[in-house]
């Protein structure tokens, strides 16, 4: 009996090693492109963005989920770094603070050129990986960080932003967040306001991916129905597996499928198991469910490392991605499906967003109605509190000019 137990144990170990080896072989040519990592936030909170401090050395930093050796061990070849500031910056210094976080990402690329290469388009991601670099891209987490300005949106694009999360844990004046669905916030726009729809259109024109993590279900549906390009959820999981309002319900997954969009699964325990503890296997359950409902082309990885506190057993840091891929292979995911999950689905969506951008040329020039803005910390040059009055004055001036011209002729 003992011999039989030993034999089956040995067989299980060999099978496990086989799946792990297969995972690593796949990842050597198709690396992880992760949708969301909050290391820049850690650089702020731990080191006040002083990257040259000896204790901030990313080759040795131990207290974060992410460092250079862990990225290498995890076969991470592309990373969307989150440029994030909390909601209490809204209507205050949000734009200044997000510029500082974007600067951190650029300085990471400058300080570690042998590891990080800042890129801004889909074709450069795999080229950077083939040069042995981690392609580094910028996602801005929270629509409050554009301060309801299309000009700021365009400027952040020129600084490298390639996705914008429409809300964080607060409404913007033009989009509702997920706390509305929980009953902890009031619906102000019932999804997207008219100005919010202009923001979406301008993102399509620029080639900025629309990120629907953190938004309300109504905002999800508005964006999926209105966007001319596929959208992403950069760090969200499946509501049917864990009914947390930050996750994506099945009816929205159907829209994800019909629009060729993408859900990049979050590893935070509360979104994985709806409790303080979770396992790698439960993360795989989310991936299985999204694949079943929306298709294998709709799944990606957005671990949310360094943005959360509790992570599943087996996925404690960014080095653990090969173990997750091995589990999916054990569950009979095909190599094609795995390569899609790792990188190819994201590259497809990113390329489609760029294609739409190439055919949209005219920028939006409307501004948000001034009454939608908190005016305590802002000026209003160029705005009008009563546009109808200005139109009447304009018409009057035109009439007077016509009258003066007529009198001159007399």
Curated annotation (Swiss-Prot):
Activity regulation: Inhibited by L-penicillamine. Beta-lactamase activity is inhibited by cilastatin.
Bilayer disposition of the protein: Lipid-anchor; GPI-anchor
Keyword Disulfide bond carried by entry: yes
Sequence positions that bind Zn(2+) 2: 141, 214, 235
Cysteines paired by S-S bonds: 87-170, 242-274
Family: Belongs to the metallo-dependent hydrolases superfamily. Peptidase M19 family.
Role of this protein: Hydrolyzes a wide range of dipeptides including the conversion of leukotriene D4 to leukotriene E4. Hydrolyzes cystinyl-bis-glycine (cys-bis-gly) formed during glutathione degradation. Also possesses beta lactamase activity and hydrolytically inactivates beta-lactam antibiotics.
GO cellular component terms attached to this protein's record: apical part of cell; apical plasma membrane; cell junction; endoplasmic reticulum membrane; extracellular space; microvillus membrane; nucleoplasm; plasma membrane
Gene Ontology biological-process entries: antibiotic metabolic process; cellular response to calcium ion; cellular response to insulin stimulus; cellular response to nitric oxide; glutathione catabolic process; homocysteine metabolic process; inflammatory response; leukotriene D4 catabolic process
Protein name: Dipeptidase 1
Sites carrying sugar chains: 57, 121, 332
Lipidation (GPI-anchor amidated serine): 384
Annotated signal peptide: 1-16
Binding of substrate, residues: 168, 246, 304
CDD domains: rDP_like
EC number: 3.4.13.19, 3.5.2.6
Quaternary structure annotation from Swiss-Prot or TrEMBL: Homodimer; disulfide-linked.
């Amino acid at each position: 009996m003992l011999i039989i137990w030993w034999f089956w144990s040995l067989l299980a170990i060999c099978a496990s090693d086989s799946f792990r080896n297969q995972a690593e072989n796949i990842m050597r040519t198709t690396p992880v492109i992760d949708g969301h990592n909050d290391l820049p936030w850690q650089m702020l909170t731990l080191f006040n963005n002083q990257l040259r401090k000896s204790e901030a050395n990313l080759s040795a930093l131990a207290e974060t989920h992410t460092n250079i050796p862990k990225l290498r061990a995890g076969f991470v070849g592309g990373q969307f770094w989150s440029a994030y500031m909390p909601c209490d910056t809204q209507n205050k210094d949000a734009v200044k603070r997000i510029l500082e976080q974007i600067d951190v990402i650029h300085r990471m690329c400058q300080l570690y050129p042998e590891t990080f290469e800042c890129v801004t388009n889909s074709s450069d991601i795999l080229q950077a990986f083939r040069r042995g670099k981690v392609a580094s891209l910028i996602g801005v987490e929270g629509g409050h960080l554009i301060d309801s300005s299309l000009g700021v949106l365009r400027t952040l694009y020129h600084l490298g932003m390639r996705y914008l999360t429409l809300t964080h844990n607060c409404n913007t004046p033009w989009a509702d967040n997920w706390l509305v669905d929980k009953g902890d916030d009031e619906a102000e726009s019932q999804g997207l306001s008219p100005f919010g729809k202009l923001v979406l259109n301008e993102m399509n024109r620029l080639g900025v991916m629309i990120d629907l993590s953190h938004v309300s279900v109504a905002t999800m549906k508005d964006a999926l129905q209105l966007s001319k390009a596929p959208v992403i959820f950069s760090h969200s999981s499946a509501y049917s597996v864990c009914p947390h309002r930050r996750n994506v319900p099945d009816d929205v997954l159907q829209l994800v499928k019909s629009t060729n969009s993408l859900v990049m699964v979050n590893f935070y325990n509360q979104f994985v198991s709806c409790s303080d503890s979770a396992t790698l296997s439960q993360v795989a359950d989310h991936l299985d469910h999204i694949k079943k409902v929306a298709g294998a082309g709709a799944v990606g990885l957005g671990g949310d490392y360094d943005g959360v506190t509790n992570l599943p057993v087996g996925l404690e840091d960014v080095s653990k991605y090969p173990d997750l891929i091995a589990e999916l292979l054990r569950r009979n995911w095909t190599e094609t499906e795995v390569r899609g999950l790792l990188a190819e689905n994201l590259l497809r969506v990113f390329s489609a967003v760029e294609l739409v951008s190439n055919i949209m040329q005219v920028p939006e020039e409307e501004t948000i109605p001034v009454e939608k803005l908190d005016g305590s910390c802002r000026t209003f040059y160029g705005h009008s509190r009563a546009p109808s009055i200005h139109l009447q004055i304009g018409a009057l001036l035109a009439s007077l000019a016509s009258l003066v011209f007529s009198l001159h002729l007399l």
